[in-house]
Amino acid sequence: MKISISNKNVYVVSDIHNDADGFKKLLKEIAFTDDDILIIDGDIFDRGDKPIELYFEILKHPNIYVIQGNHDVWVKREIKEKFGNQKVGEYISYNTVSIMEKRLTPVDMLNIADWINQKPYYIELVLDDKLFHIAHAQVYVTTENVLDKQKIYMGDAHYDDFINGKNETYEGIAIVGHTATEDRKIWKSTSGRTIRIDCGNGYKCYNSRGFLAAIRLNDMKEFYV
């Protein structure tokens, strides 16, 4: 997906992991308005205990873009298999579907799967003449031509080199989540062209240290809750 934006603040957050309360706090922290843009860089779902509340909070904001992460793909596949009798791929089952099915109808569940399925695997963003590649795990010189989408939301054999800033063959700046940073702060490569924004929020439900982090692409200001 390619978009061009000018004269708007653009924020990116990833790996929310069912943390509806943390997400609402983050929106307040960045003073999010209808004139801003927020991109969720994958992994809305799993681990935390409020997937429904998070889903409906996201739906309130037409100026939020969503990218599919591996946990979102797995939730989509599990729903389609359990409620649509469709085997559409392998998945790892966490807690999201079991929480949702207690409160939502099968039709509602399938609507969520369809909503996830409509989301892109990456966004190529031009913001005031600056180029950004935003994907859950890994970007490529021509991400749109990658046939195996799992490489985008899970990474490939060169993933470790990529997240350490050793494979910056693309133009512009890459923004990714997926793997939590070691110090739970937003990480930037020496060149500044690879930026990792998963700061371990998904592990807080296991009583582990982590933050929900966002970066404002206009000036690279960081926000944490």
Q: Where do the model's predicted regions map?
A:
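Core catalytic region of metal-dependent phosphoesterases/phosphodiesterases
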Residues: N9, V13, N18-K87
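Active-site neighborhood of phospho(di)ester-bond hydrolases with catalytic His/Asp-centered motifs
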Residues: V13-S14, L38-G42, V66-N70, A135, ...
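Catalytic phosphate/metal-binding cores of nucleic-acid and nucleotide-processing enzymes, i.e., regions
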Residues: S4, V13, K24, A31-F32, ...
